[in-house]
Amino acid sequence: MLCAHFSDQGPAHLTTSKSAFLSNKKTSTLKHLLGETRSDGSACNSGISGGRGRKIP
């Protein structure tokens, strides 16, 4: 969901984030439950929004 939040970058990024999210959905969910969304968010958003995901508290 963190990747989808930055879908404002354009349809190309939306497709990329969607593919990445679907591929790592289980991993992302586990990390979210473990409170590691910051690490997952940075890695995911770094390639989609140029690292803006690092602003996630």
UniProtKB/Swiss-Prot annotation:
Which parts of the sequence are annotated with region: Disordered? Answer: 38-57
Q: Which GO terms describe its cellular component?
A: cytosol; nucleoplasm
Q: Where in the cell is it found?
A: Nucleus
The answer to whether the entry has keyword Nucleus is: yes
Ordered alphabetically, the record's keywords are: Nucleus
The tissues in which it is expressed are: Highly expressed in prostate, rectum, and distal colon, and weakly expressed in bladder. Expressed in prostate cancer cell lines.
**Protein name in UniProt:** Small nuclear protein PRAC1
Q: Which source organism does the UniProt entry give?
A: Homo sapiens
The organism's taxonomy opens as:
Eukaryota, Metazoa, Chordata, Craniata, Vertebrata
- Tell me what gene encodes this: PRAC1
